[in-house]
Regions:
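Acidic, low-complexity cytosolic segments
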Residues: 1-4, 10-144
Length: 144
């Protein structure tokens, strides 16, 4: 089950936030939550790179608690995709890379009205992203 998605640029600016099956709110503003998320990712990525006993080619990819899993993909441009799911979700790296190439590149990067470094606000992008997420087998409630 997909809970929410953050997309950050290489400077930590929140480019997009989407929410689908999130059951619990954090109690803070979305801006504060995004800053906490980016700070945590920055620290965790640094920690993994420094403490890893082997060369971490991909570095930090995800972490899992007993309630949710956080998945992380960074593309070559420095754009960071963070997806929170239930703990049984698999294939998230491929899902996020497809989201990047099929949705972000097509409906944000190729949009002549979008300015690099500004959040993605296009209604077409939002609609296509929502369609992409809802069409994924990851979207719905897990069957117990």
């Amino acid at each position: 089950m997909i809970y929410n998605l953050y997309i950050f640029d290489k400077y930590g600016t929140l480019m997009y936030y989407g929410e689908w099956n999130r059951l619990k709110q954090s109690g803070i503003t979305k801006d504060e939550e995004a800053k906490l998320m980016y700070g945590m990712l920055f620290s965790l990525k640094s920690f993994v790179n420094k403490i890893s006993p082997i060369d971490p080619k991909e570095g930090f990819l995800f972490y899992k608690t007993n309630k949710y899993a956080l998945h992380y993909v960074e593309v070559s441009s420095g754009l960071k995709f963070v997806l929170n799911t239930d703990t049984t979700a698999t294939g998230i790296k491929d899902f996020l890379l497809q989201l990047y190439s099929k949705i972000w590149v097509e409906y944000v990067v190729r949009n002549p009205l979008w300015t690099i470094g500004t959040p993605a606000t296009s209604d077409l992008f939002k609609a296509k992203l929502d369609e992409f997420v809802r069409a994924s087998p990851l979207f719905g409630p897990k069957i117990i």
